[in-house]
Amino acid sequence: MAENFHILLLNGPNLNLLGTREPDKYGNTTLADIVSELETQAQALNVKFSHLQSNAEHVLIDTIHQARGNTDFILINPAAFTHTSVALRDALLAVAIPFIEIHLSNVHAREPFRHHSYLSDVAVGVICGLGADGYQYALQTAVKRLSTSN
């Protein structure tokens, strides 16, 4: 049953500035708007949903470690840590919780240094370039995968 599932959303550095930061790339939707929409969607899907945004890599890693044993799926927009953080990758592998990597912009249509991800090859999937809607698609996919695997 979906009501037993817990899905954790993690957002990395600078995503607290959504809505005002480079709206041509990231849109005008704030992170609070995205989270509010996901909370509504999670309630409709009858799943527990929690969220954390941090600009600090160690906070995201500690949160991933704490998710072990009580979280069924992670949705993560690692932001700039996508391209730099082996530690974030190792944390996700260590807890063995399935996850979807999310990006608001199409990272493959941007600067070459953004084309590499330390997470995508170990993620269930990657959603990029679909703006805030990508988060909703990720949540729907996580619930569907959990529902069909149990």
From Swiss-Prot:
Pathway it works in: Metabolic intermediate biosynthesis; chorismate biosynthesis; chorismate from D-erythrose 4-phosphate and phosphoenolpyruvate: step 3/7
Annotated catalytic residues: 26 (proton acceptor), 103 (proton donor)
Enzyme nomenclature, EC number: 4.2.1.10
Matching Pfam families: DHquinase_II
Intrachain disulfide bonds: none
Keyword Transport: no
SUPFAM superfamilies linked to this entry: Type II 3-dehydroquinate dehydratase
Site, as annotated: Transition state stabilizer: 21
Record keywords, A-Z: Amino-acid biosynthesis, Aromatic amino acid biosynthesis, Lyase
GO biological process, any: quinate catabolic process
CDD domains, per database record: DHQase_II
Cross-referenced InterPro entries: DHquinase_II, DHquinase_II_CS, DHquinase_II_sf
Chain's role: Catalyzes a trans-dehydration via an enolate intermediate.
Subunit structure comment from the entry: Homododecamer.
Family: Belongs to the type-II 3-dehydroquinase family.
Name of the protein this chain belongs to: 3-dehydroquinate dehydratase
